[in-house]
């Protein structure tokens, strides 16, 4: 699929097994095995590094005592100048996480950063992940957004940053397109998640040809 292998053992990508439920011609419920390809945030970083376009990259969880100000209109963000007085990160105070940050600098000298508040990320997940909305409604834990919100939040901010402002190699373009595609036993791919709950705004990750409503999935990992 890619010119250079993406190793799932290193946390770059994963195939998540699903049981897809459907009614057969006799009206009986049946299940078929499917697998969803998921790029992890480390995978996007690896592909960016391999492209040779990027001089530096970084990403981070942001704690309340590290943030001075954030302007959602201009995108400008200011952190404290002295992190030695910031204790929340070292204490592992997860309830003090206020946002997620990613930054890159190209070899041309161009640099760009992106910050999303925790609320921004949560709203994004609710809007574009049917599985996450299902978990919230049914109080279940079938979505990666539910079981590992931090990893998915970092992935979202990195993916948005690269897709909006980065230089995308062929592999990076393919990874953005293939992310969250679900495959059946015959290798046919479709997008069963990552759809907005309403069509009022364009999905920045939308794929053409995914007009069907996503079906309910049972994760079997």
Residue ranges and their predicted role:
Residues 172-221:
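Glycine- and charge-rich intrinsically disordered segments
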Residues 3-168:
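Binding-interface segments
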Residues 1-3, 172-173:
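Accessible peptide chain termini
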């Amino acid at each position: 699929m890619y010119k250079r292998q993406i190793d799932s053992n290193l946390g770059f990508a994963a195939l998540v097994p699903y049981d897809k439920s459907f009614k057969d011609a006799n009206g009986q419920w049946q299940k078929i095995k499917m697998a969803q390809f998921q790029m992890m945030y480390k995978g996007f970083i690896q592909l960016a590094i391999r492209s040779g376009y990027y001089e530096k990259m970084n990403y981070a969880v942001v704690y309340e005592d590290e943030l001075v100000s954030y302007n959602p209109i201009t995108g400008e963000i200011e952190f404290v100048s002295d992190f030695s007085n910031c204790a929340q990160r070292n204490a592992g105070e997860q309830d003090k996480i206020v946002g997620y940050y990613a930054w890159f600098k190209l070899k041309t000298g161009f640099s760009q950063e992106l910050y999303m508040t925790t609320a921004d990320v949560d709203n994004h997940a609710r809007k574009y992940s049917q599985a996450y909305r299902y978990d919230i409604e049914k109080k279940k834990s079938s979505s990666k957004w539910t079981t590992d919100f931090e990893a998915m939040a970092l992935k979202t901010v990195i993916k948005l940053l690269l897709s909006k402002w980065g230089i995308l190699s062929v592999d990076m373009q393919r990874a953005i397109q293939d992310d969250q595609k679900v495959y059946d036993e015959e290798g046919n791919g479709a997008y069963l998640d990552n759809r907005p709950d309403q069509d009022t705004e364009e999905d920045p990750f939308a794929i053409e040809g995914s007009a069907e409503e996503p079906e309910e999935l049972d994760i079997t990992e």
